[in-house]
Design a protein with these regions (language model features):
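Metal-dependent DNA phosphodiester-chemistry modules and their immediately adjacent helices/loops
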Residues: 115-256, 263
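C-terminal effector modules of nucleic-acid-centric enzymes and ribosome-associated factors
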Residues: 437-440, 445-448, 453-555
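Beta-strand-rich binding/interaction modules
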Residues: 428-438
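Accessory interdomain/linker segments of ATP-dependent helicases and helicase-like nucleic-acid enzymes
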Residues: 7, 284-429
Length: 555
């Protein structure tokens, strides 16, 4: 854990209130997010029990599966969920704007700019916690290969028409959520924990009620007591006053309330199926409806507090100004959303169960690159985050004491000004290290010089630097040679070189991330990674033939 995060948590314990971990909002927050609060049944992974979903905080849509073991009722739930989610997504898919992007020319292989469509905005799905993201990913994996009655008329348990499409979108959102900095699918606990430091552990921060209790405790109470109350307080019936944010439910709720209600619903359904006449059928239908209504009330009692907590978290986040680089990351999300929309429109098959070697390598490289970019951009956007990097020796703020103009020894000399700077930080800046500062939205690099290099060209300046003239107690002098972003002429452009007295923050990490090496086509990978496809008629090798059964295989 970074030192500044540890200090913030200690301060939260001392004051009884969460401390800011950021001064700006580091994630995009849609003006109209779709909030999803799901519940699942204990004992079976991904078996839905119900959900609250919608974009209106005052009018959520309640979806319930009265008997989670009934496959038809599950499909009905998924179809209703699709009827809410897909129209929301299609609203954004229909609004496009022209945009330029760089692509490889198929004939020449050169990178050229082309004009294409980009969705003007993208949807945003907000769930209470990380377990909600995993459930979205699980629902996508379980449903994107479903066959509808139209596709497979004779197949058992055909899925409603929109369920496979919902699965494909959920799969895309779940995969995109693994990309650092993405905001298409976000967990409220992660958003709040990124912007506030509480007096509890990171694992305890996954409890939405406790996290909000630290950030915004009730009047006259402190975060520790309020969080403990949110985690443990129960009513006279033994039910938690602050239900879990889901998708898992509290065992006391399952055993005392849910299981008896489901049993009453099953009994009412069986009795209705055995009805002998119309009068008894009407009476039993009313009993079945009442049992279902009871189940709906139970599910709403567990999901509505979480629904309100998610919107309360959204209100807290909206009080923060948006970071400068958030729009850039959201544009990447828009490109991702547009690309998946185009794949669906082109009739491409669902995402495969397992990625091939090249696709997997590309995804890993993308996540590593985006993580480095996110770390750099958050520090550039937020002085509080940059302070943490300075404490870690990865950046330093320095005052320019002197500027000496030097030039390269080439036929066409270029400016290479040498700066003498004074800092109170302790950066890990050995001679030869590159450092960077932001200039007009782009990075300008410089190189840390050793005093000996300066002494060769200017003995007097080298002696002053070696003696530490100009540095007070706890201060350090550094020599920086500016390397780029000064124009093409002999004299640097105005404003491209720091002036004496300027105070500048330099970083030891790069601001932009370069792309990795070009990966081979899947057909050209070695046999250890899938390899070329076998030629037609090729005999299977011994590695693909089943082992013969021997007596040792039988007990």
């Amino acid at each position: 854990m970074p030192l500044i995060s540890t200090l913030a948590r200690l301060e939260a314990v001392r004051t009884g209130r969460a401390q800011p971990a950021a001064t700006v909002l580091h994630r995009h927050l849609s003006a109209r997010p779709l909030v999803l609060v799901p519940l699942t049944t204990a004992g079976e992974a991904g078996a839905p029990l119900g959900a609250l979903v919608g974009t209106d905080r005052d009018a959520p849509r309640l979806l319930v599966v009265p008997q989670p073991a009934d496959r038809e009722l599950r499909f009905t739930f998924l179809a209703r969920l699709a009827s809410v989610v897909l129209p929301y997504i299609e609203e954004y898919a229909a609004q496009v704007e022209p945009a330029e992007r760089t692509e490889a020319d198929p004939e020449t292989g050169k990178r050229v700019k082309v004009v294409t469509e980009l969705c003007a905005d993208a949807p945003q799905l907000v769930v209470p916690g990380r377990a909600g993201i995993e459930l979205v990913r699980l629902l996508g994996r379980a449903n994107r290969f479903r066959r509808t009655a139209e596709e497979e008329p004779e197949g058992p348990y055909p899925a409603p028409e929109q369920v496979p499409l919902l699965g494909r979108w959920f799969t895309h959102l779940g995969e995109r959520a693994r990309v650092p900095g993405s905001s298409l699918l976000v967990a409220m606990t992660d958003l709040l924990a990124r912007h506030w430091a509480t007096g509890q552990s990171a694992l305890e921060d996954q409890h939405l009620g406790a996290l909000l209790a630290w950030i915004d405790p009730p009047a006259g109470d402190d975060g520790d007591r309020a969080a403990r109350h949110a985690e443990l307080a129960r009513d006279e019936e033994g039910q938690l006053l602050c239900p879990p944010a889901g998708p898992a439910t509290d065992p006391a709720f399952d055993n005392k309330l849910l299981a008896p209600a489901v049993e009453r619903y099953d009994q009412a359904r069986r009795a209705l199926a055995d009805a002998q006449d119309g009068e008894s059928a009407d009476r039993l239908l009313a009993a079945t409806t009442a049992a279902e209504r009871e189940l709906r009330a139970l599910v709403e009692s567990r999901t509505r507090p979480t629904w309100d907590a998610v919107w309360r978290g959204i209100d807290l986040l909206r009080e923060l100004p948006e970071g400068a680089h958030v729009t850039d990351r959201w544009t990447r999300d828009r490109w991702s959303f547009t690309a998946h929309r185009d794949r669906l429109a082109a009739g491409e098959p669902p995402q495969p169960r397992r990625d091939d070697a090249v696709t997997a390598a590309q995804k890993l490289a993308t996540r590593e690159r985006e993580q480095a970019r996110l770390d750099a951009q958050e520090a550039l956007d937020d002085p509080l985050v940059m302070a943490g990097r300075r404490l870690a020796g990865e950046a330093f703020a320095a005052e320019v004491l002197d500027v000496r103009m030097t030039y390269t020894e080439s036929k066409r000399p270029s400016p290479r000004p040498v700066l003498t700077v004074r800092t109170e930080d302790a950066p890990h800046a050995a001679p030869g290290t590159k450092v960077y500062r932001e200039l007009d939205g782009r990075p300008q690099s410089a190189e840390v010089l050793a005093p000996e290099e300066v002494a060769e060209a200017d003995p007097e300046a080298g002696a002053e630097l070696a003696a530490g003239d100009g540095a007070g107690p706890g201060e350090r002098l550094l020599l920086l040679r500016v390397l780029d972003r000064m124009g093409r002429g002999r004299e640097p452009e105005e404003g491209s070189v720091p002036e004496k007295g300027d105070r500048i923050c330099w970083t030891l990490f790069e601001h932009d991330q370069r792309g990795g090496p070009k990966l081979p086509d899947p057909e050209e990978t070695p046999w250890t990674h899938g390899g070329p496809p076998e030629p037609p008629g090729a005999l299977p090798g011994p590695a693909t033939a089943p082992d013969p059964v021997t007596p040792e295989d039988l007990l």
